[in-house]
Amino acid sequence: MRLQELPQYVAIDIKEALEERFMDSEAMYVRFLRKLLTTDDYRLMEEAAEAGNWQEVLRYAHNLMGVCATLGLTGLQTQFADIVSLLRSGDYTVPQLQAKLVAVKNDWQRTLQYIEELESA
């Protein structure tokens, strides 16, 4: 799959990411997108959630929110931001958090699947 096809499947702002953060280098941008395939933060966030360690969930969700913002992954950025806001507010139920984590998991997995299919720039 070509980079320019990615927005058909994933909420992503390629133009802004390329212009603002990757000096219009598609090769560098794709290289950084592919780094998502090897990050442990998402797995660690899931493990923390399973253990009920919401402070760790906050930490990893915040990290992932920043990474997604840098990469222009607007959909995932928004979902991680929602998790961060909910945890910071302290006004949440475990089922609310679990619902948000299930939603972000689906988008995370789908996004990684499409990133795996990217051709080198």
Regions found by a protein language model. Give the residues of each.
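Two-component system phosphorelay core
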Residues: 1-59, 63-121
